Amino acid sequence: MEGGRNCVMTVQQWQPEYNDMNQIRAIFSLLYLLVWVGAIVGNTLVLYVLTFNQVSLSVRTVFVGCLAGSDLLMCLFSLPITAISIFSRVWVFPAIFCKLIGVFQGGTIFVSSFTLTVIALDRCVLILRPNQEIVNFPRAVFIVFCIWLLGYSLALPVGIYSDIAVYDEICGTFCEENWPDFNPDTGRSGIRRAYGLSVLVLQFGIPALISSICYWMISRVMSDQLARRRGHNIRPESETKLVNRKTRANRMMIVMVVGFVLAWMPFNAVNLYRDLFGISKWYSTVFALCHVCAMCSAVLNPIIYSWFNPQFRQSITTLFKGTDEARLIKKKPQSTSKMVSYPTNFSEIRKETEIASTKTKITIAENDYRAGDQLL
């Protein structure tokens, strides 16, 4: 008997699943622990460098800080609660958390996806319109506010329709989604299916498409720039340097898009399968694997968007050396996105480049640069 109910079996006895096996639980416990520690350490270091170190306040720091904060919150609260719920298969937390966790988890996921999209758009605008102040510091802060408001608003339906459930014969308390048109015979809901499809499009489809287009446009500008420079009889070593920069930048952009797709596509696919076909004996195990992959984005994001930046690397190195070099440069707000220093050196603008040939010496001044010249 439990809480006045005559429960006669556990949920594991009533409906066994593969994730009830101790071997599977041990494997996933290790995976979740590694992701949890990696994400907390990585994003905490990013926030430390942005807040207390020598990185200037700029458009880029606003967006990267938003991404790191969202990922950190997701791993501090959402990850452990979801992991425990998957493998215990009962709700062991306070009842109010049943409603809050759905909103919190969905909101942080939306915020991360939208922030990654905004970073891609900001880079693209910076390259295509380098002489125009499109996004300044106040606008960046406002954009971040809108991202958080929109992200958590889109996640509200899960919280509204989530509630505690108990069953007479099954021991334990459960946190379940109870949509208005839920059919207990089929275990499906048309409203939940429509909402799931909307989440797939808004959280994964549109961000992946926009990011891919932005980075493709950036790559095209870089290729045009490299071809234009080659027409000036540049020295072989200068051409090699330009090619290496283009290759490095292209590699980084590919990692950004592929990392986002590989992290979130399985998670969205398994959720879509649940909405369309219901759950089966293997669903919880596959969901756990896809959830681990999605949480890996919180480990990958600090590496891609922060640590590949030489300034961040130097600050982190200084931090671990225990010196005070990180505070030598006073933080100073920058009002234009042209001051942004992206991890792949996209915004490095060379004031003057001398191109030597056998008979002539061509000097290209700063005002002779075209859109995208700061990429290489």
UniProtKB/Swiss-Prot annotation:
Subcellular location, record wording: Cell membrane
What's the domain of life for this entry?
Eukaryota
Question: Which Pfam families does the record match to this protein?
Answer: 7tm_1 (PF00001)
Q: Which stretches of this protein does UniProt put in the Cytoplasmic compartment? A: 51-66, 111-139, 219-251, 306-376
Which miscellaneous remark does the UniProt record hold?
Functional expression in mammalian cells is temperature-dependent and requires a temperature shift from 37 to 28 degrees Celsius for receptor activation.
Q: Which organism is it from?
A: Caenorhabditis elegans
Q: Does the keyword Cell membrane apply?
A: yes
Query: Mind listing the UniProt keywords for this protein, alphabetically?
Result: Cell membrane, Disulfide bond, G-protein coupled receptor, Membrane, Receptor, Transducer, Transmembrane, Transmembrane helix
Q: What does this protein do?
A: G-protein coupled receptor for flp-15 neuropeptides. Receptor activation assays suggest binding to predicted flp-15 peptides, GGPQGPLRF-NH2 and RGPSGPLRF-NH2. Likely involved in Gi/Go-coupled signaling pathways.
Listed GO CC annotations: plasma membrane
Member of which family?
A: Belongs to the G-protein coupled receptor 1 family.
**GO biological process per UniProt:** cellular response to light stimulus; G protein-coupled receptor signaling pathway; phototransduction
List, alphabetically, the PROSITE patterns matched. G_PROTEIN_RECEP_F1_1, G_PROTEIN_RECEP_F1_2
Name of the protein described by the UniProt record:
Neuropeptide receptor 3
Which residue ranges run through the membrane? 30-50, 67-87, 90-110, 140-160, 198-218, 252-272, 285-305
**InterPro entries given in the database record:** GPCR_Rhodpsn, GPCR_Rhodpsn_7TM
Q: Is Cell membrane included in the keywords of this UniProt record? A: yes
Report the SS bond pairs: 98-175
Membrane topology listed for this record: Multi-pass membrane protein
Extracellular-side stretches of the chain, per the record, are 1-29, 88-89, 161-197, 273-284
A GO MF term: G protein-coupled photoreceptor activity
